[in-house]
Curated annotation (Swiss-Prot):
Its main location: membrane. Its EC number is 3.6.1.26. It comes from the Bacteria. It catalyses: a CDP-1,2-diacyl-sn-glycerol + H2O = a 1,2-diacyl-sn-glycero-3-phosphate + CMP + 2 H(+). It is found in: Cell inner membrane. The keyword Transit peptide does not apply. InterPro entries: CDP-diacylglyc_Pase (IPR003763), CDP-diacylglyc_Pase_proteobac (IPR015993), HIT-like_sf (IPR036265). This is CDP-diacylglycerol pyrophosphatase. It comes from Escherichia coli O9:H4 (strain HS). Pathway: Phospholipid metabolism; CDP-diacylglycerol degradation; phosphatidate from CDP-diacylglycerol: step 1/1. The chain crosses the membrane at residues 4-24. Keywords: Cell inner membrane, Cell membrane, Hydrolase, Lipid biosynthesis, Lipid metabolism, Membrane, Phospholipid biosynthesis, Phospholipid metabolism, Transmembrane, Transmembrane helix. GO terms for biological process: CDP-diacylglycerol catabolic process; phospholipid biosynthetic process. Pfam families: CDH.
Amino acid sequence: MKKAGLLFLVMIVIAVVAAGIGYWKLTGEESDTLRNIVLEECLPNQQQNQNPSPCAEVKPNAGYVVLKDLNGPLQYLLMPTYRINGTESPLLTDPSTPNFFWLAWQARDFMSKKYGQLVPDRAVSLAINSRTGRTQNHFHIHISCIRPDVREQLDNNLANISSRWLPLPGGLRGHEYLARRVTESELVQRSPFIMLAEEVPEAREHMGSYGLAMVRQSDNSFVLLATQRNLLTLNRASAEEIQDHQCEILR
């Protein structure tokens, strides 16, 4: 019993330290880097000079920009042209807010242009991290390659993923995930953030604790993946963990 109690105490301490590290990472000036790039560089340059640089694309009327990330040869970020911190923002469950996941999926073409040939849809993944799983305080969806092992696991579970949010057998990367199948027409009409908030019990009240990802399946449907922060299992809900920014899947 004493050993069990000590182990539990150690886990609590680790969780608290992890939470503290996550908070520290989000309180420094560097956490505003992406926001400053969008609001002080990309957007003004597009409006004044019709040049999106340093972004790859700026769409003021649609409310988003696309930026080449420095990490990895093909990774891009889709971000709003206005202030949204992250998954905790109530704006994301407002139907009038742009459907950023659908927009990010359209922006996958930047990967192919950079690569010099078509990057197949099965190799592409989208991900956004939770409040404690991110390093930046400006909403950004990672557009990048999927890890080969995650691709294989999702392929093997194709028949087990339904149109309801259900636990993905075995989870991913050692963490629990909910999975939901969506069609392209569904995705066009409803944001994954709204699906999560309306369909998973108590999710609306804790949206900031979720990381969310999206991958295309072999039957042309999409699978949405949601993981919730659980510091006792050292899960900071960094959905980006399903991605491989070096794109081994293309080799």
